[in-house]
């Protein structure tokens, strides 16, 4: 049987730590004769949270809520910090399973992360990696502090996290590209562009005689504003036949955010996007 742990996302909870401890237990008897497969996907930056020494899961939860819910910080800016306050991320998971042979897989399209399978781009991906926890990353403690300052979040960051970033040493830094390469590990993307929902939507639209256009696969904005812009394009197509002639299906994809502030809310980014778009079109 394969066990399952059900942690929270995007704000991590104690179940995240529980799941990581189970992974840690698996590594205790690893030898060089073992072959270890890991599979990670979207959301693992939160789901696979295992706080570094002197940082609690409650502090990381409060920090995550402040960054993503209150301030609307994109995951690409949050993840470098996550890797520096965690026991598994930033390649540390690969260290854990040394000296086994490692095969890392991700349920994402590597090309969408700017990682086509060429050697030079592969090294660039490792150097600037922010989305694949088992892999190395060239992001530093100084980068993390700069991100927090950019978002005016330093003063609201828990002291334990501040201290780790300020006192970071080479011994506690993320795994370097050179160290990761020395492991001889392999990395594969399991889901490619043609296996996503877009081809299916395009095919269904064609059955109804409708043209289908992807406005953006990399949308990163406030969900409400993204909905307003896409709805305005739909209205323009209907009323002026620009930039497309109606009838047409307009699609967009990416990772939008909803900045909630200190208040609480119900729903998510897709509801926010759709509500804003629907009210504009109506």
Regions found by a protein language model. Give the residues of each.
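Glycine-rich oxoanion-binding loops at beta->alpha junctions
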Residues: 1-32, 81
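Accessory alpha-helical/coil subdomains and C-terminal extensions
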Residues: 97-104, 119-232
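Short beta-strand segments
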Residues: 37-42, 103-110, 130, 251-254
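Glycine/threonine-rich beta-strand-loop-alpha-helix active-site module
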Residues: 1-3, 48-105
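Gly/Ser/Thr-rich active-site loops/lids in small-molecule metabolic enzymes
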Residues: 54-72, 133-151, 263-282
């Amino acid at each position: 049987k394969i066990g399952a742990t059900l942690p929270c996302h995007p704000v991590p909870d104690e179940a995240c730590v529980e799941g990581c401890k189970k992974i840690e237990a698996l590594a205790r008897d690893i030898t060089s004769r073992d072959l270890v497969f890991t599979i990670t996907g979207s959301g693992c930056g939160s789901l696979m949270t295992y706080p570094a020494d002197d940082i609690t899961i409650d502090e990381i939860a409060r920090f995550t809520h402040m960054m993503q819910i209150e301030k609307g910080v994109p995951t690409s800016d949050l993840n470098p910090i996550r890797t520096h306050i965690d026991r598994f991320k930033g390649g540390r998971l690969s260290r854990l399973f040394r000296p086994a042979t490692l095969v890392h897989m991700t349920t994402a399209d590597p090309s969408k992360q700017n990682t086509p399978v060429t050697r030079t781009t592969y090294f660039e991906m490792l150097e600037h990696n922010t989305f694949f926890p088992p892999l190395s990353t060239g992001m530093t403690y100084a980068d993390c502090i700069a991100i927090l300052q950019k978002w005016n979040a330093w003063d609201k960051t828990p002291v334990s996290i501040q201290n780790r970033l300020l006192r970071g040493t080479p011994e506690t830094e993320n795994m370097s590209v050179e160290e990761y390469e020395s492991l001889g590990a392999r990395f594969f993307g399991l889901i490619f562009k043609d296996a996503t929902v877009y081809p299916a939507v395009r095919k269904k639209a064609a059955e109804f005689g409708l043209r289908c256009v992807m406005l953006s696969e990399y949308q990163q904005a406030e969900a409400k504003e993204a909905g307003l812009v896409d709805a305005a394009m739909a209205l323009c197509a209907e009323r002026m036949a620009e930039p497309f002639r109606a009838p047409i299906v307009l699609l967009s994809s990416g990772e939008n955010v909803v900045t909630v502030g200190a208040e609480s809310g119900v729903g998510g980014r897709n509801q926010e996007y759709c509500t804003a778009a629907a009210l504009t079109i109506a």
